[in-house]
């Protein structure tokens, strides 16, 4: 395997070719990653991923510690969340996937109506949404937003299911929010807005209101939306003037909520003062909202749900689920987000967490970082699956030929990597119960990350043998394009390799290696030097031990 620049590698390759029975184990010369277009083309042509007749891996939406709420589409995810929160409901609130501003104030109304929120396409009622409505046995629907975001056809589709439909739609998002507030005041069964809490949040961005939404549901608290300048309009102020709430909460700093809004919020609080929850970033604010909810509103850290801050859709329906459980929603970007740090400081109170959305929303690496922060193993993730990659082999260079890799002392690297990969995979599956895919069939080296992703794997461990006159074992991660958690994965697996092989520890290193570049947290193991007779004698005397040690390290990462 190459460990140097092209020029040096070429010189060493020429020199070593003069030594009988020896070869320099090079990586292919070009280690730049493929473009997304090239990867998508390979997927479309069936060059990566499961073959049509290949059995699909068993899917798991949850483990003892993690629940995943992720469907093929945002409508599937929404339906999963709604049906987890409710087995039956008279009402449903239906919002369009293009109308998140209208949905920001929906969770409080869902608390008043004691019902779930469902997401639909704006052009017609999504099949998944219709199916969820049937399962819930709903007879009434409230839709939010005008025909620019939700067509008349959606209303017709709902009515064809036998639902009485009330559409709440104003000329602006603040007008719609006021219609939601007035609707909640005359809700059936004697339920209405409580006086426990009221919140004020930007109507121009969703992050702060989304973090507060479980509280809005649980407390039946109205959320009043400010305009682009952070101000309330006269109708909003008039509706609240003279009311007194136990908590009047302003979400976000002066950029999104003006000083006038803060002052007005204080005037409708029994204490005469608003509670301002505003951090330097949307993630800081999310952590502050969660802490306030736990400390002041009887919420809990258990069952905390992580969701993306890029789009609101994965958490709109989930906010109701969180509100029913009195659990928090936490916005996350990566493992260093303040929300992760906040939850980790309370990990003794956490027996389960949730993820809203798939890997595009909360990446594999971020999930793995969260698991470590909470003191759990990667394998505690729902759906955790390891891609064990045997280096080299058939079509490794995308030329249709079988690539032996390094050759030395009568051994071919590709034979050794395939054997060890199979051993590690068998131990992971049969001893530790960890799902894995063993790639002992080769394939273009630049597509192995994509293959792992297409097979829904969470992490990747690539097995290689070294060459070039040295001795010992080492591991690699990508020098500049490693997925989040790659270093932690390397740091966890490297000692297992060293312990198993028992040769010199050459260290944890970085290198530009295509198989390590991409969305999958990955590390590459250089087991020993194939052209060193002592290294190979040592390895061959303990193949099972090496496999067991590596598998143990992966299982306990």
PLM region spans:
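Bacterial N-terminal signal peptides that target proteins for export
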Residues: 1-8
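Extracellular glycan-binding segments that recognize GlcNAc-based cell-wall polysaccharides
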Residues: 6, 26-379
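Bacterial N-terminal signal peptides
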Residues: 11-19
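Second-shell loop/turn segments in exported
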Residues: 67-69, 94-97, 201, 307, ...
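Extracytoplasmic/secreted envelope proteins and their assembly/folding machinery
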Residues: 78, 106-110, 130, 155, ...
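Active-site histidine-acidic residue metal-binding/catalytic motifs
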Residues: 378-449
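A short, glycine/acidic-enriched catalytic loop
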Residues: 395-412, 467-495
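Active-site-adjacent mobile loop/cap segments within catalytic or ligand-binding domains
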Residues: 455, 460-470, 476, 507-557
């Amino acid at each position: 395997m190459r460990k140097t620049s092209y020029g040096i590698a070429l010189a060493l390759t020429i020199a070593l070719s003069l030594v009988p029975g020896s070869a320099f184990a090079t990586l292919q010369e070009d280690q730049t990653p493929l473009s997304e277009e090239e990867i998508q083309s390979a997927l479309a042509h069936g060059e990566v991923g499961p073959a049509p007749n290949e059995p699909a891996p068993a899917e798991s939406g949850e483990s003892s510690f993690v629940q995943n709420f992720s469907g093929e589409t945002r409508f599937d995810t929404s339906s999963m969340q709604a049906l987890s929160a409710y087995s039956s409901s008279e009402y449903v609130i239906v919002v369009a996937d293009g109308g998140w501003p209208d949905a920001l104030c929906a969770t409080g109304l869902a608390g008043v109506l004691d019902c779930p929120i469902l997401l639909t396409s704006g052009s017609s009622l999504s099949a998944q949404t219709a199916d969820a409505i049937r399962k819930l046995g709903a007879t009434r629907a409230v839709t939010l937003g005008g025909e620019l975001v939700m067509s008349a056809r959606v209303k017709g589709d709902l009515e064809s299911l036998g639902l009485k439909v009330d559409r709440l739609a104003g000329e602006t998002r603040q007008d719609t929010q006021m219609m939601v507030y007035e609707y909640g005041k005359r809700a059936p069964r004697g339920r209405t807005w409580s006086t426990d809490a009221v919140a004020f949040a930007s109507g121009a961005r969703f992050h702060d209101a989304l973090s507060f939404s479980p509280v809005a549901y649980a407390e039946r608290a109205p959320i009043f939306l400010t305009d682009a300048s952070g101000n309330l309009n006269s109708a909003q102020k008039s509706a609240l003037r003279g009311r007194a709430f136990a908590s009047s909460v302003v979400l976000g700093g002066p950029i999104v909520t003006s000083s006038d809004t803060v002052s007005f919020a204080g005037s409708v609080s029994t204490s005469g003062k608003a509670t301002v929850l505003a951090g330097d970033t949307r993630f800081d604010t999310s952590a502050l909202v969660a802490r306030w909810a736990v400390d002041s509103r009887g919420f809990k850290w258990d069952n905390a749900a992580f969701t993306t801050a890029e789009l609101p859709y994965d958490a709109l329906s989930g906010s109701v689920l969180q509100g029913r459980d009195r659990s928090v929603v936490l916005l996350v970007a990566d493992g260093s987000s303040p929300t992760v740090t906040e939850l980790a400081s309370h990990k003794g109170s956490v027996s389960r967490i949730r993820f809203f959305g798939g890997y595009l929303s909360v990446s594999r690496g971020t999930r793995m970082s969260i698991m470590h922060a909470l003191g759990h193993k990667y394998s505690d993730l729902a759906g955790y699956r390891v891609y064990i990659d045997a280096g080299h082999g058939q079509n490794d260079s995308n030329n249709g030929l079988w690539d032996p890799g390094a050759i030395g002392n009568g051994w071919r690297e590709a034979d050794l990597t395939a054997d060890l990969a199979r051993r590690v995979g068998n131990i992971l599956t049969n001893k530790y119960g960890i799902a894995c895919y063993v790639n002992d069939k080769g394939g273009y080296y630049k597509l192995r990350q994509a293959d792992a992703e297409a097979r829904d794997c969470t992490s990747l461990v690539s097995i290689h043998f070294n060459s070039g006159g040295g001795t010992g074992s080492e591991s690699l991660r990508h020098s500049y394009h490693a997925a989040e958690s790659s270093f932690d994965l390397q740091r966890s697996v490297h000692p297992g390799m060293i312990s198993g092989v028992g040769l010199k520890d050459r260290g944890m290193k970085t290198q530009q290696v295509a198989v390590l570049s991409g969305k999958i947290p990955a590390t590459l193991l250089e087991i020993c030097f194939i052209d060193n007779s002592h290294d190979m004698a040592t390895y061959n005397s303990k193949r099972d031990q090496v496999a067991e040690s590596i598998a143990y390290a992966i299982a306990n990462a």
